[in-house]
Design a protein with these regions (language model features):
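Active-site cofactor/cluster-binding pocket
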Residues: 1-155
Length: 155
């Protein structure tokens, strides 16, 4: 069993990377994992690049630093691929998931892709966490469908 899995999210402010990280953390927490989810902001304006982090493992997490060498990188805005920060600390064999849909619920769809890439959390746990945290913004059915769509796109 892997001791600690670390995910670094890259997006622009307002695209939902922080929220996606929180949804993933909630789903993992409910499967018995220890989790951390936190954002790192630059200038606080809509559209500015930002990072969010998700860290999880089977034991309590004692570190509280930014993720420098991620096990998985998620990019919600493909225009950020040219940013050096996206490649920072990324090994040649590190998976990088890139949203190319540009859809309104891209962050939710990418949650499904992350779960498929990692093999956890279970799809239903992720769907329920999305409904719980985002149910006021979209219908439960739309959220479940978006997560499932991302999960089905694994390749």
């Amino acid at each position: 069993m892997r001791e600690l899995t670390e995910i670094r999210w890259h997006a622009r402010a307002g695209q939902g990377a922080k929220t996606a990280s929180q949804v993933l953390a909630l789903a993992l927490l409910r499967t018995g994992k220890s989790v951390q989810s936190f954002p790192e902001y630059g200038p606080e304006r809509r559209g500015a690049p930002l990072r969010a982090y998700t860290r999880f493992g089977p034991r309590p997490i004692r570190r509280h630093d930014a993720i420098e060498h991620p096990d998985l990188v998620v990019v919600l805005d493909e225009s950020l691929l040219d940013e050096p920060a996206v490649r920072e600390g990324v090994a040649d064999d590190t998976p990088v998931l890139v949203n190319r849909s540009g859809g309104r619920m891209a962050n939710v769809e990418m949650l499904g892709a992350v779960a498929a890439a990692l093999g956890e959390p279970p799809l239903d746990a992720l769907q329920e966490a999305a409904v719980e945290l985002l149910g006021g913004k979209s219908s439960p059915e739309a959220l479940r469908d978006a997560v499932a769509e991302g999960y089905a796109c694994r390749s």
